[in-house]
Amino acid sequence: MFKYTRFEKARIIGARALQIAMGAPVLIDVPEGITPLEAAIMEFEKGVIPITVIRPS
């Protein structure tokens, strides 16, 4: 798995949590009553978030 900086990780999880809160489908099975932020963190840990990071070369 790719190593992200803490800033990249925060941006990815925050953006995905916002998407989930706005109605995007969750890509993993999550328990009932979980918050969008918790769901985004679980997706990040499993490596299934459909967001890419482009770094300058």
UniProtKB/Swiss-Prot annotation:
Enzyme superclass (EC): transferase
EC number: 2.7.7.6
GO cellular component: cytoplasm; DNA-directed RNA polymerase complex
Keywords: Cytoplasm, DNA-directed RNA polymerase, Nucleotidyltransferase, Transcription, Transferase
Catalytic reaction equation(s): RNA(n) + a ribonucleoside 5'-triphosphate = RNA(n+1) + diphosphate
Primary location group: cytoplasm
PANTHER family (UniProt xref): DNA-DIRECTED RNA POLYMERASE SUBUNIT K, DNA-DIRECTED RNA POLYMERASES I, II, AND III SUBUNIT RPABC2
Family affiliation: Belongs to the archaeal Rpo6/eukaryotic RPB6 RNA polymerase subunit family.
Identification of the protein by name: DNA-directed RNA polymerase subunit Rpo6
